[in-house]
Amino acid sequence: MLILFCADIEIRLIILKSRGYFCSVEEKKLPYKVIGGKPTRIEYSADDVFAKIKQEEIKFIDLQFTSLPGRFHHTTISANTFTPDQMEDGLPKLDGSSIVGFTSIDDSDLILKPDPNSFAIIPWIASKKSARMLCDIYRGAGRGRLETDPRGICQKAEEYLKTQGYDESFWGPEVEFFVFDKIHWDVL
C-alpha cells in the first residue's frame, strides 16, 4: 500500500541516519505526514510545487516512473528551466524503446507528465538540493496515455474497483534494500 510504503521509507531513512548513512530527514519533506500515528497524504497543486521549488531553493527535479517489470527509472532536469506549461503538458524526455515493455523504436517518443501530488524533496541529497515527482507517461503528438504505463494501469484498475462498489483502494510498490555493516567476497 502506498501510504505504508512512504511511511516505511521515512522510518528506514531515520534508522539509516542514526547509523550515519544519510543527512537528517525532516518529515515535512516527504509526501506524507504521520498524524496521530496514521499516515496522511500532503496534497500539492502545480502552483504549490513551484512555490516550494522557489522557497526551498531546489536545484534539480527527478522525473520518476516505473517500467512494466517494476524497475524504477528517472530523468533529472534543472529546476530553473521547469515551467508551468511543462507541468501541465508534460516533458518530451523519454525514449520509450529503451524501456522494457513500452514501445518499439519506430514509435518511441513519449512524454513524462509530472504529478504535483507526488512532489517531495529528496532528503539525502543535501549539496545540490533536489526534489522528485512521479510521472504519468503519454504518447507523443497528443495520442493519449501509454497503455503500458504501470501508473495508468493502476489508475484504471482503481476506477474499475469504484464502479464495483469499493470506496477506497491503495496501490504502490514496496521498495526493498539492505544495509550491510561489512561485505566480503572472493574473486577468482
What residue ranges belong to the model's regions?
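ATP/Mg2+-dependent ligation/transfer catalytic cores
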Residues: 20-188
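Short, positively charged and aromatic/hydrophobic N-terminal segments
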Residues: 3-4, 8-17, 21
